[in-house]
Amino acid sequence: MSQQEEMKNLTLLGSKETPYIFEYSPQVLESFDNRHADNDYFIKFNCPEFTSLCPITGQPDFASIYISYIPDQLCVESKSLKLYLFSYRNHGDFHENCINTIGKDLVELLNPRYLEVWGKFTPRGGISIDPYYNYGRPKTKYENMAEQRLFNHDLYPENIDNR
């Protein structure tokens, strides 16, 4: 498949008009074919400027979000991911729900072999919340990998003063 064919379904990348959506919007996510589906490899996104709203107070919440996955046939297009995460800006939800929803939306889009999403939210009221979501494709080695990474994901927590 040529690069031009591969990118024909990408509507956001290279667009002169970037549609910034201010409400939760999973339909903005786009994918492209993984040319290296014969390899297991990680793709990692570091998203240090995530914002959402507290569903009770309406106050802004800030986080760094780390998304890592082992693709199968599809990869997420990074500009669409940026716009998708931006769509949470005026979305009111708890930290745990945001991270789980992001993970589930990406699993639905990509059907990856493995995926994890880790949110590191800045403290509010003196407490920081760091929800972690992961997924391993059922009945494969990735299901076992997900279980092991879930059990061990935070064995060496960082100092709290890093935020």
Curated annotation (Swiss-Prot):
Which reaction is catalysed here? 7-aminomethyl-7-carbaguanine + 2 NADP(+) = 7-cyano-7-deazaguanine + 2 NADPH + 3 H(+)
Q: Which Pfam families match?
A: QueF (PF14489)
Pathway(s) served: tRNA modification; tRNA-queuosine biosynthesis
Q: Which residues form the active site?
A: 54, 61
The name on file for this protein is NADPH-dependent 7-cyano-7-deazaguanine reductase
Name the source organism. Answer: Streptococcus thermophilus (strain ATCC BAA-250 / LMG 18311)
> What InterPro entries does the entry give?
GTP-CH-I_C/QueF, NADPH_dep_7-cyano-7-deazaG_red, QueF, QueF_type1
Role this protein plays? Catalyzes the NADPH-dependent reduction of 7-cyano-7-deazaguanine (preQ0) to 7-aminomethyl-7-deazaguanine (preQ1).
**UniProt keyword list:** Cytoplasm, NADP, Oxidoreductase, Queuosine biosynthesis
Name the principal localization, coarsely classed.
cytoplasm
Keyword Metal-binding (UniProt)? no
